[in-house]
């Protein structure tokens, strides 16, 4: 117990120290929100990766999808790496940096307002962020209760409050730079932790080969492959179609999430983009692939305490139960690992929410003529507000809020992905097409919440994203275009000449 507590104390002390160190970078709006747009490849890549994966993934999704799809759930992690990281950096990274800097936009709603010349779009986008990002913020605490109960026998509410307080301290003090530096430290913990845990868990089952053999003997209880042995060790698992929906939602979804795309706003230069692409992809393979691979063995640890009174599986309990027999030192590493994942995601979410509310809604609408210093102070106050709100919701979420948690990822990505990506590449996107994407993304996910015309909320989110990719070009072809001169001026940012060394690019003959 003493070792586990010591690890926690050291971890929190480092987080706060980084916040104090990063204060010098948080004196301006650009510095507080984007780290002065000069963050290097390692910090940006780790900020992207650690914001991607929280306790929701490690404790919730890994247990739930590992139970449902067996070892095939590893495809989710690989999809996160290839689509959610590699392709996201390649397709969005450079153009996001160039165009947002040209437009001087600091948030995704601000981008919509400037790119499509519509204050109404900017305000609506900020409202969508507020409505769906706050419940998602509260969801990062999910899974902590069982894990801390197993490791320390500490009540859930104290875990939530402690995590929120320490996260708030370093975000308020150092803004984006403190978040990025802490993300780097947390990445090291997550990387070492997940490898150690996988090796320890498999060793407890007689090694990798024996664990596979035992898994292969478990008959499928999924309707499409009912009773078949070997389904949970097959290439695509017992239910490939629903597995595909999970891959699309958790991988393609990052392309439209403000807290993820915002990392590209802050990146420093071309070298940072190239290096960051490789680092973030490798990070996702190890962390996300490792989490889902570990969860894929969940059925080997089935026990009565993992079922409720009605006999239903308690998915959040699977991973903690798998880890309960590990030595104290490894349990301590796991606790710090999950805390790292959750705090990095929480920091990114509250920073995104506070900057969006301050810069896209309060500034120039409610609070006129805000000075640079006042904007930073307001964002710091909003960080406190959002963290307190997330704690209140996490303690006892109302039914509707709990439902919003389940659809927030799909609603945000469904609304924003298509108009953001197309807006970076295609001059022909119209204002009406952006409105249509907002309506489709939010409409499909929210209506499905009430009418259940799509059985799985995850599939509903995936369909919302794909719908946006279809709706935007179709509506753009049928509706009036934006002013050509203005659009040409925006896209001229890609034609500006830059000088680079020959080690970065060969000259044309």
Walk through the language-model features, giving the residues of each.
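Membrane-embedded helix-loop-helix hairpins and adjacent transmembrane boundary segments
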Residues: 1-509
